[in-house]
Amino acid sequence: MKTIKAIIASLALFAMFAGTSAQAKVEIQWWHAFGGRLGELLDEQVNKFNASQNKYTVVHTRKGNYSETLNAGIAAFRAGQHPNILMVFEVGTASLMAAKGAYVPMYQLMKDAGQRFNPKGFVSAVSGYYTTTDGKMLSMPYNSSTPVLWVNKDLMKKAGLDPEMDLSTWKRVGNALDAAKAKGIDMPFCTCWHSWVHLENFSAYHNIPFATKSNGFAGLDTELSFNSPVHIKHIQTLGKWAQEGKFKYMGRRNEAGKNFRAGECMLMTESSAGYAGIKKEAKFEFGIRHLPYYGATEAPQNTIIGGSSLWALSGKSKEENKATAAFLAFLSRTDIQAKWHQDTGYLGVTTAAASATKKSGFYKSNPGTDLAGIQMMRNKVTQNSKGLRLGSFDQIRGIIDEEMEGVYNGTKTA
């Protein structure tokens, strides 16, 4: 009798543990490039998702900057140790699109998981970057931004300038830098992301090609073509300012943002997503303006996006893919997108998020935070302003940065 009771007890215990195992959460991995304030805000999103349901757990890991994260993802995929979700900056989009079999397309992932998904709910100027010519979205836009001009109003006053003065053209910016230099301002101008701001977006904003084949959207056999008179004029101007001490070069990426946040730089061209760090750290009054253009241009066209999208990598189980789909659906929710947009300065990538933000009064109480979206969508896109889709673009950018450094230090001409 005791033996029978022991067997029954053992079976009950086994059933209990089997039930616990069956109810264990499915864990997925997300590799990204965010540290600092953006990393904190990303962590908030993950924690909120994990707490919102009891089926899935997302574990996020920073793998370095954008380039390092992409390279880590590629290496891990080859070794069969890759994450479920990989953050890929816009420069890597063409390379991922060409790597068929390495990812599960967004539209297919959501369909297979039974998740409601409306690609038309995304802002077309953003989603077009990650969508095939026949309208199929391959990855989910996550953090999309565009460059703007940041203004340290306190230093403008110190330079004897009206902090609200017109800075819409590069000529007017040059006049402000002259005044700042004359007043002893050590860093009148600085910039982040040189190629992205001063060649890629510069081209789109002036409606001139950066590369042939509609900047890569119309074919693979693409050639770079940023050698127009206005391109040359702008790079020569930057070089001249650098030689005159009006423009201080701080690094190829967003290193100059640290100087601006510390109150050292008067005018800075940087991503709209600089907002998160500037709002948190700046001890001065700052403003946001549209990216300047050359007055010879009748009117600026539109800028293009930077930032990243999230790719669901292949080779994962059906249950893990369901977890990935659930998490991406969560991230695209209006409330999540609106908060991310307001906290970071990244664009609201869904039309509903932008509408909710406007309705909340956020733009009125935070002047300038709507300029990035206006600047990107001010005109119907052209072949020159739709964006860029070039293979090996990260390497191309590295070469461009090296050449621009030569112009800044006076060893090369535009």
Question: Where are the language model's segments positioned?
Answer:
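Glycine-centered hinge/linker elements that transmit conformational signals in sensory
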Residues: 174-180, 217-250
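Short, solvent-exposed loop/beta-turn-alpha elements that line the ligand-binding surface or hinge
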Residues: 107-122, 166, 208-233, 280-281, ...
